[in-house]
Amino acid sequence: MSIGVGVDIVTLNRVKDAIETAGQVFLDKVFTPWEQERAKQHSNPTAYYAMLFAGKEAIFKTFGIGWETGVKLTEIEIRDGNFGEPTPTLSGVFAELMKARGATKVLLSLSYDGEYAIAMATLV
């Protein structure tokens, strides 16, 4: 049973500009240390960051909440699963909200093409 659905799309240039403007401050605010290390290994780090950003925003939207709840995007970590699929792990406020809603996992799809990265998340 689906508890919540979220979709997000972002331009690669938006993420590139944020990295160029705020640098490590932006990276540390949005991405976990593991995600940052993984991005360095990617053939297109900007696209990788953009997909992760879209994924985190899509997951955020599955909860139907606002930022006043105190959530942080670093409370969502997206790693590669056994078959390369994006596998999110939630901690902090996100983990508490997930438990309160009776959800057991988040299904996530990420993609990019040209100048756009897109994500769809389902809370189940």
Where are the predicted features?
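Core catalytic alpha/beta fold that binds nucleotide/phospho-ligands
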Residues: 1-124
